[in-house]
From Swiss-Prot:
Chain sites annotated for binding Mg(2+): 173, 193
Cofactor(s) the protein needs: Mg(2+)
Lineage: Bacteria, Pseudomonadati, Pseudomonadota, Gammaproteobacteria, Pseudomonadales
GO biological process, one term: ribosome biogenesis
InterPro entries for the chain: G_OBG (IPR031167), GTP-bd (IPR006073), GTP-bd_Obg/CgtA (IPR014100), GTP1-OBG_CS (IPR006074), GTP1_OBG_dom (IPR006169), GTP1_OBG_dom_sf (IPR036726), OBG_GTPase (IPR045086), P-loop_NTPase (IPR027417)
Protein's recorded name: GTPase Obg
Region entry Disordered, spans: 128-148, 336-397
Length: 397
C-alpha cells in the first residue's frame, strides 16, 4: 500500500433538528396545551487513532465527510432522534491542524484516543418550552443550529523511539533488517528507501524498542534536493538519533564530510531536533582491512571532533550490532525512568517535543509555499503576452 503521510479533508457536523409546533388534540380535550417536542442534536465528527492503519491514503480519495443531522421534534412531546456521530479512523501518530487558523487541534498518539473536530448543531426547541402563565398556547419554536465545519490537514508522524540518519546507501535499511523483523527494500543504488520503515527491535523478553528508517538525505535537502526534508518530520517523535555513515564509500568521498553535511541539513530543518542526542555509527567496517580498521575509524572520529558515543558495526554481517542495540535499550530505559521520577525533566522533554513539532511544521509549510510559488512562476512564463504579437514571415517558395 502506498505510504501517504499528509491529507486535507473537510468535515462538517450535523445540523440540529428543528423544534415542533404542536398542540394536544384528543377526544374530550378540545383545547389541550402545547406538546411540541425538541429536535435532536446534530452528530459530531471525531477522529480516532487506530493502530491497524499506517497511512492516510484513504483520505486522498474522499475529502468531504459529514455527520448525520438531528431529526425534528414531534407532537406528544416527542424529542427528535440525535444525529449519529461520525468517527473517522486515522493512524496512531496523526496530528490534526485547522487549515484556516493554523491551530493544532490535537495529537493522536495512543490507540483508541479520540478527538472531536466538529461539534454537532444544538437542537431546536419545541413550543412546549415557551409555555408560561401568560402564554398558554405558544406558537413559538426555535430552529436547530448549524453544525461546525472545518478544513483540516492531517499530518502523520511515525511513532518510534530511535531514528536513523544518513546519506543514501549508508546502510540504514540493511541495519534495520539486521536487528529487527522489518524487511525494507535493499539495493546498491541511492534512494532505494522511498518511504519510512518501522522495525521492532527485541533485545530480550519484555525489552524492545521501535526504530524508524527514513529515506536518505543529501546535501541541499532543506532546499528540496533529493527527496527533500518532508520525511525528516518523522524523526520529531524519536528520543535518540543513530547517525550511520559508510566508512568506505565506493566513490572515495570523505565519511566525515558526509556526517557534517547531514548535521547541517538537520540544523536547517529544526535546531531543536539537531540538539537531540545523536550517536555516531560507523557502518561497513568489514570493507576495511582488519589491520587498518582501528586507525581508519579513529581518524574519522578525530576529524569530526566527535565527543558522543561511537559504535563500529557491519550491518550486513551483524558485527557489532548486538552491543549497539543493548546500549540503545539501556539508554531508553534510563530516559523513561528519569521522566517518570522527575516531573521537571518530563515537562522539559514535552516542551522540547512541542518546539520540534512547531519548527518542523513551519519549515515544511515554508517549503510547500516555495514549491507552489515556483510552479506559479513557471505557469506565468508559459503565458507571456508578447507571444500573441509574434510576426509571422513566410519564406518564398
Amino acid at each position: 500500500m502506498k505510504f501517504v503521510d499528509e491529507a486535507t479533508i473537510i468535515v462538517e457536523a450535523g445540523k440540529g433538528g428543528h423544534g415542533c409546533l404542536s398542540f394536544r388534540r384528543e377526544k374530550y380535550v378540545p383545547k389541550g396545551g402545547p406538546d411540541g417536542g425538541d429536535g435532536g442534536d446534530g452528530g459530531s465528527v471525531y477522529l480516532e487513532a487506530d493502530s491497524a492503519l499506517n497511512t492516510l491514503i484513504d483520505y486522498r480519495f474522499q475529502r468531504k465527510y459529514k455527520a448525520q443531522n438531528g431529526e425534528p421534534g414531534a407532537g406528544r412531546n416527542c424529542t427528535g432522534t440525535k444525529g449519529e456521530d461520525l468517527v473517522l479512523p486515522v493512524p496512531v501518530g496523526t496530528t490534526v491542524v485547522d487549515m484556516d487558523t493554523h491551530e493544532v487541534l490535537g495529537d493522536l498518539t495512543k490507540e483508541g484516543q479520540r478527538l472531536k473536530v466538529a461539534q454537532g448543531g444544538f437542537h431546536g426547541l419545541g413550543n412546549t418550552r415557551f409555555k408560561s402563565s401568560v402564554n398558554r398556547a405558544p406558537r413559538q419554536t426555535s430552529k436547530g443550529s448549524e453544525g461546525e465545519a472545518r478544513n483540516l490537514r492531517l499530518e502523520l508522524k511515525v511513532l518510534a523511539d530511535v531514528g536513523l540518519l544518513g546519506l543514501p546507501n549508508a546502510g540504514k535499511s540493511t541495519f534495520i533488517r539486521s536487528v529487527s523483523a522489518a524487511r525494507p527494500k535493499v539495493a546498491d543504488y541511492p534512494f532505494t528507501t522511498l518511504v519510512p520503515n518501522l522495525g521492532v527491535v527485541s533485545v530480550q523478553a519484555h525489552q524492545s524498542f521501535v526504530i524508524a528508517d527514513i529515506p536518505g538525505l543529501i546535501e541541499g535537502a532543506a532546499e528540496g534536493a533529493g527527496l527533500g526534508i518532508r520525511f525528516l518530520k518523522h524523526l520529531v517523535r524519536t528520543r535518540l538519533l543513530l547517525h550511520l555513515v559508510d566508512v568506505a564509500p565506493y566513490d572515495g568521498s570523505s565519511p566525515a564530510d558526509a556526517v557534517r553535511a547531514i548535521a547541517h541539513e538537520l540544523e536547517k530543518f529544526s535546531e531543536t531536533l539537531a540538539s537531540r542526542p545523536r550517536w555516531l555509527v560507523l557502518n561497513k567496517v568489514d570493507m576495511v582491512a582488519e589491520e587498518d580498521r582501528e586507525a581508519h575509524c579513529q581518524a574519522i572520529v578525530d576529524e569530526l571532533g566527535w565527543e558522543g558515543p561511537v559504535f563500529r558495526i557491519s550491518a550486513l554481517s551483524g558485527e557489532g550490532t548486538k552491543p549497539l542495540v543493548q546500549a540503545v535499550m539501556r539508554w531508553i530505559e534510563e530516559q523513561a525512568e528519569q521522566e517518570a521520577d522527575n516531573p521537571d525533566f518530563a515537562e522539559q522533554e514535552a516542551a522540547r517535543r512541542r518546539r520540534m513539532d512547531e519548527e518542523a511544521r513551519q519549515k515544511i509549510e515554508a517549503d510547500r509555499q516555495a514549491r507552489r510559488a515556483a510552479r506559479n512562476a513557471d505557469d506565468d512564463d508559459d503565458f507571456d503576452d508578447d507571444d500573441y504579437d509574434v510576426e509571422v514571415v513566410y519564406a518564398p517558395e
